[in-house]
């Protein structure tokens, strides 16, 4: 009897041991399955995250803009830029090539008249440009803000010698003077011989000659320009209505701008008539209008000087509205910075700009 019980006990123990092994195998199998499932899930999550990241990259694709007009580009703009003085005496009109300037300045010189400065990029396609006139210190100052060469014909004692104000000379004056490099300019003989223009109103250059001069003088460095300007197709700002804007210079000369709602641009007029580009016959028009107020003082011979480093007030007009702004500039080779009165960076409309530098005892009139 005892032998039978012992045998039964051994059999029971063997059966229990087998059951335990089967459970361990089952648990191990379940654990491996769980781990595999977890791995698959992690891979799927990574795929989802990867797709989300790719989607995010597409949505956040960087937008490249032209540094002076804000036009959208496929890649960063790497071109060359230069500026030319433009004679604006009544007897010198019409001017040529000016409608293709990206930025167009007007500043009062001596005698109560104004002179203009046209800033061009990729100027090879521009035809005749001018009439070209002599330089002044403030033209040297403004072109230094862009770090671009100035095309001119002689100048005042200060303007022709690289001064950027009444006391300081540019460390590196980048310029092309017709008196030194006449090969990049030409005289319009028809103007002088048949049309009754004075000699000083007959000097021109061309976009092609400007580009050639930049290459010959080593000024054609193609770099990524960044002047710190912000642009939008439709700038948002709380301005007053301004369909008519009149710039009044210290000597009384005016420049009038009328907003054309059909084109979204301000059309220029001076001397009692439309401001015309003689090369195309079109009226000068601008997306942005800026008036920058600063101290204007006079030296020998009535020469004007302007404080263009520091800060001041101004006005900005775009899309039929106008708002007060502030401008600042920290150093001679630094660009102008524009903000709203509360310090918010100013956003310009995509397109070209007219900029008037005027005495801070003057202002603009608008309605």
Predicted stretch roles:
Residues 22-70:
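N-terminal, intrinsically disordered, polar/charged segments of Gram-positive cell-envelope systems
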Residues 53-101, 105, 110-367:
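A surface/extracellular/periplasmic glyco- and lipid-processing/surface-interacting theme
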Residues 2, 38-45, 50, 186, ...:
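Short, intrinsically disordered low-complexity segments
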Residues 14-17:
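C-terminal motif of bacterial Sec signal peptides marking the signal peptidase cleavage site
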Residues 2-9:
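Sec-dependent signal peptide recognition
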Residues 12, 22-23, 27, 212-216:
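Polar/charged alpha-helical tracts
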Residues 11-12, 191:
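Short N-terminal leader segment in a subset of presequences, especially plant chloroplast
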């Amino acid at each position: 009897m005892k032998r039978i019980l012992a045998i039964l006990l051994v059999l029971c123990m063997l059966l229990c041991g087998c059951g335990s092994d089967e459970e361990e195998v089952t648990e191990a199998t379940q654990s491996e399955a769980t781990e595999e499932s977890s791995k698959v899930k992690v891979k799927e999550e990574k795929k989802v995250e990867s797709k989300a990241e790719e989607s995010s990259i597409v949505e956040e694709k960087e937008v490249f803009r032209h540094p002076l007009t804000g036009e959208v580009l496929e890649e960063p703009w790497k071109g060359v830029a230069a500026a030319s003085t433009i004679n604006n005496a009544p007897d010198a009109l019409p001017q040529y090539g000016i409608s293709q300037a990206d930025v167009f300045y007007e500043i009062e010189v001596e005698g109560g008249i104004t002179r203009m400065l046209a800033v061009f990029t990729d100027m090879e396609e521009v035809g005749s440009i001018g009439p070209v006139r002599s330089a002044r210190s403030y033209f040297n100052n403004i072109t230094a803000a862009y770090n671009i060469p100035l095309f001119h014909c002689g100048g005042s004692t200060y303007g022709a010698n690289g001064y950027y104000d009444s006391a300081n000379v540019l460390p590196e004056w980048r310029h092309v003077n017709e008196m030194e490099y006449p090969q990049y300019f030409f005289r319009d003989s028809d103007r002088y011989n048949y049309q009754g223009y004075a000699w000083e109103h007959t000097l021109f250059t061309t976009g092609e000659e400007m580009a050639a001069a930049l290459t010959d003088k080593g000024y054609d460095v193609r770099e990524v320009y960044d002047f710190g300007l912000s642009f939008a197709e439709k700038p948002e700002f709380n301005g007053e209505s301004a369909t008519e804007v009149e710039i009044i210079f210290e000597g009384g000369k005016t420049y009038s701008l009328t907003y054309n709602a059909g084109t979204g641009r301000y059309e220029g007029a001076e001397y009692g008539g439309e401001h015309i580009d003689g090369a195309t016959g079109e009226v000068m028009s601008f997306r942005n209008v800026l008036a920058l107020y600063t101290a204007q003082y006079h030296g020998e011979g009535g020469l004007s000087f302007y404080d263009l480093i520091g800060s001041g007030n101004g006005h900005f007009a775009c899309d039929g509205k106008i708002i007060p702004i502030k401008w600042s500039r920290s150093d001679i080779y630094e660009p102008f910075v524009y903000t709203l009165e509360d310090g918010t960076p100013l956003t310009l409309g995509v397109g070209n700009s007219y900029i008037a530098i005027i005495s801070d005892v003057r202002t603009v009139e608008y309605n």
